[in-house]
Amino acid sequence: MAAAAFCCMTMTVVFTACSDDDSNKPGGDAPKTTYKYLHYADARDNMSAEESSQYKAYCWRLERKDKLQEPKNWRTCQGELTPNEESELFPDPDYEPSLEGLRQLNISGSSDLSAKELDWVKAEIEKLTDGPIYIIDVRGESHGLINGLHVSRYGANNWGNVGKTHAQIVAEEAAEIHAIKGQTIDIYSLSKNDNYQPTESGRSVTEATSAQTEEEACTERGLGYARFTVPDRAFPGDSELEAFVEFVQKLPANAWLHFHCQAGAGRTTQYMIFYDMMRNLSVPLKDIAYRQCLLGGNYLLYDGSAPGEDPVKAELCAEKAQMIPLFYQYIQENFPTGYKTKWSQWKRQFSDK
């Protein structure tokens, strides 16, 4: 069902992937590419109610237990660059990426966070900076903290909010979380083996004595918070990208950003790459993508073409592999003007290619 629904957004032009070399020329000519995926994010953001109904969330999903511990996929830009399963996808496996500007990036990443994991992250970052700390939440799906547990509303493809605006998502999420307090709810541990369907063995009956949005939990701890609503495994919509560019421009020089999505792999890496792009204009995209992967993230220039790849994942990978280099080109060309030309306006020049 999910694969069929996603394919319905396919445009009628043919995709030609940009080469690894062409995508990494700072300020160079645009890759000679047919931009099949130019408007895919727009199509997701504007999906009709009928189309999006098949992704409707159907249960509360347990994601992080409330333990004082290092969260999954925790890393900073001061960490070691280590080969991993994702780096096996590198087209140039012997390439050593530049470290230029990397160690000076005040950013970190991880999975989502329980209340005590949020405390752990705050304490760790405070060892590294005396500046303001911002939690950068790049999840499109509704989530929050119940009794300190990190939970989310889960639907097919983890796209429970696809087609909704940023404002809708944030408002509905807060209402759902606050309505739980004092109630008894079922929270499920979901498994890939069960196709992420709720099972009796995975059910936990929970009396919600406390219920907070993530923003409320951050504010309570003196942390800044910013939300960019991006569907799982997807490239961001225009409004979310433009909001991020504007947000970064207004940050204090000594700010530290901690990015997270659900697992701390795809969307987290994507936004760490975006930040790296904006702060290190002289570094080729290839180096940025490789080093963010070797720090512990995903390799996001992978085009999904491996034999036997899941078709939905393959399409989403191909989208990112095409659109991330284009966004890199946007950053290169528009930094000198302070991004006066918005991303949505700039990319129109490629609509007829």
Regions found by a protein language model. Name each.
Residues 18-258, 270-353:
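Cys-dependent protein tyrosine phosphatase-like superfamily
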Residues 3-14:
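Bacterial N-terminal signal peptides
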